[in-house]
């Protein structure tokens, strides 16, 4: 990373913003040690399960990530970040304990995927919504979101790498111990987190952090109480920016849903590498994503828009084609880095656009609605992924999925210019 970037980025953050970045980094590192290796890796390598089993695991994960995100968004809007964070910690520790205790049979791993998915979804607002509790300044929000994205992507390096070594030395299920250790560290760091709510409610009692959180959610508590999910859905689809963003993410991620259930078989049968490589190649994606977050940090404010997001999403597709296009692990490594760079730009852009558009008192649930579109796009291809893999082969199916991921944002850029210009004006 260029030496001129990090000091500027580091000094621009408040103390609470730095604490938030650390909270997200630690809890997300725990999730990254466990999902791909602990669930998909156990099914593929330890159990010798079929594509159907891994597809079911991803289906369960995605469905319960959606349900968890709705529950987490509602909890955040009702009680604020501190209680939401505590419940996220409890959920992660309980999930890790249960998976370790009950063994690695296929049915148990699938049930573990349910609990892990719900916990990961519940914790999503830490990255997507908490920054808006610290500031409402768009430039500062972009910096915080870029910082969160950067260190979340460091998690994608550190988590799978540690998980890969643990899986190679012990077993794929042992990675859940790492998840629990990382979660405990996140709790320690997050103990001093205090939302800064003066930009929302100037009369908040400075001597009461709990009152500050409640004031931060809305200057009118009765209004906050009446803000239901139906209102949040209406907020998304009556706002041209949010509605278009929902459609962009849904359509762009539709092809990407085929990757999760098939990637482990791509490693085993096409690249012909062991389970440890699942972690190490994921870490390569994290290296790229850190670089992408640096790019996002340096974007001028006028480029924080939907057109830039579409270009980044198209780059995701191109990177995925390089990743799965050959049987050579070296090429896959380069593809993962390219893919990571693109995702490193996408995530902070997406979160900043949502946070500067949605009302704070509904932000948790608005992000849940946006997350639903993202995750449902990943669920839909699971119904046909096993058939496609059996008919065309794993690698050809993944290449086809990469082509879809590339083509959708390209088409939206070419043919949706009028809608993009209208959203930009708003």
Question: Where are the model-predicted features located?
Answer:
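Juxtamembrane intracellular "pre-TM" segments in multi-pass secondary transporters
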Residues: 1-17, 196-246
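Helix-loop boundary and gating motifs at the non-cytosolic
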Residues: 2-63, 239-283
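Substrate-agnostic recognition of the 12-TM MFS/MFS-like secondary transporter fold
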Residues: 19-36, 61-74, 80-89, 108, ...
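Transmembrane alpha-helix termini and helix-breaking/packing motifs in multi-pass membrane transporters
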Residues: 38-46, 158-179, 269-270, 380-398
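Cytoplasmic membrane-interface "Motif A"-like loop-to-helix N-cap segments
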Residues: 78-89, 300-313
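C-terminal ends and interior cores of transmembrane alpha-helices
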Residues: 90-104, 314-327
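Helix-loop junctions at membrane interfaces in 12-TM secondary transporters
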Residues: 101-113, 324-335
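Helix-loop junctions on the cytosolic side of multi-pass membrane transporters
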Residues: 182-207, 414-425
């Amino acid at each position: 990373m260029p030496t001129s970037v990090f000091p500027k980025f580091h000094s621009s953050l408040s103390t609470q913003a730095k604490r938030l970045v650390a909270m997200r980094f630690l809890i997300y590192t725990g999730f990254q040690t466990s999902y791909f290796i602990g669930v998909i890796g156990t099914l593929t390598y330890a159990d010798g399960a079929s594509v159907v089993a891994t597809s079911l695991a991803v289906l369960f994960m995605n469905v319960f990530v959606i349900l968890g995100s709705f529950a987490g968004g509602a909890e955040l809007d009702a009680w604020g970040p501190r209680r939401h964070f505590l419940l996220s910690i409890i959920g992660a520790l309980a999930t890790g304990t249960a998976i370790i205790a009950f063994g690695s049979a296929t049915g148990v791993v699938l049930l573990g995927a349910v609990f892990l998915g719900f916990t990961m979804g519940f914790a999503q607002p830490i990255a997507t919504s908490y920054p808006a509790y610290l500031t409402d300044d768009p430039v500062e929000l972009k910096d915080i979101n870029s910082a969160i994205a950067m260190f979340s992507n460091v998690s994608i390096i550190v988590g799978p790498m540690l998980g890969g070594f643990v899986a190679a030395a012990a077993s794929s299920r042992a990675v859940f111990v790492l998840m629990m250790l990382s979660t405990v560290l996140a709790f320690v760091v997050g103990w001093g987190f205090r939302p800064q709510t003066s930009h929302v409610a100037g009369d908040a009692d400075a001597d009461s952090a709990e009152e500050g959180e409640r004031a931060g959610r809305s200057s009118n508590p009765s209004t906050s109480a009446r803000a239901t999910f139906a209102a949040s859905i209406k907020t998304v689809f009556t706002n041209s920016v949010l509605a278009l963003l929902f459609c962009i993410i849904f359509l762009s991620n539709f092809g990407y849903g085929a990757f999760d259930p098939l990637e482990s078989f791509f490693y085993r049968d096409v690249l012909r590498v062991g389970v440890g490589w699942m972690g190490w190649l994921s870490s390569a994606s994290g290296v790229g994503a850190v670089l992408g977050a640096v790019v996002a940090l340096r974007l001028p404010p006028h480029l924080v828009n939907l057109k830039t997001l579409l270009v980044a999403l198209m780059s995701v597709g191109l990177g995925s084609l390089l990743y799965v296009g050959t049987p050579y692990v070296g090429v896959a490594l380069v593809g993962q880095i390219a893919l990571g760079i693109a995702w490193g730009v996408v995530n902070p852009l997406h979160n900043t656009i949502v946070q500067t558009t949605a009302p704070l008192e509904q932000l948790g649930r608005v992000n849940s609605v946006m997350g639903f579109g993202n995750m449902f796009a990943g669920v839909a291809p699971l119904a046909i992924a096993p058939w496609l893999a059996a008919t065309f082969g794993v690698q050809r199916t993944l290449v086809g999925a990469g082509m879809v991921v590339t083509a959708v944002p390209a088409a939206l850029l070419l043919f949706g210019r009028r809608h993009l210009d209208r959203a930009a004006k708003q």
